[in-house]
Regions:
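Feature captures hydrophobic
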Residues: 1-95
């Protein structure tokens, strides 16, 4: 398990304070996946309502608040596969 992914999951848990109402997966290219749901964030690769894929730099910028997820999507740095409504709820929860 990557230390970087574990730290990212911890950062997301602090930022989101208890998860969100839905299930989402961040697929960080070449590194692995982080699941987010009502139980919070964890390093795992499970079924989700939406999968968001980005490189490590983009993902880091999103979780640190330096890059808005919507901006990342519109610029092609973040791809979304699945329920767009869930992706929007997650973006709001991360704000």
């Amino acid at each position: 398990m990557s230390e970087t992914l574990t730290q990212a999951a911890e950062t997301l848990n602090e930022k989101m304070d208890g998860g969100f109402d839905g299930s989402a997966k961040f697929d960080i290219t070449g590194m692995g996946t982080i699941m987010l749901d009502q139980n919070g964030a964890r390093v795992a690769n499970e079924e989700a309502e939406v999968t968001m894929t980005a490189d490590a730099e983009t993902f880091q910028s999103i979780i640190e608040g330096d890059l808005n997820p919507t901006t990342a999507f519109m610029s092609g740095k973040l791809t979304i596969d699945g329920d767009m409504g869930t992706a929007m709820k997650l973006a709001s929860a991360m704000a």
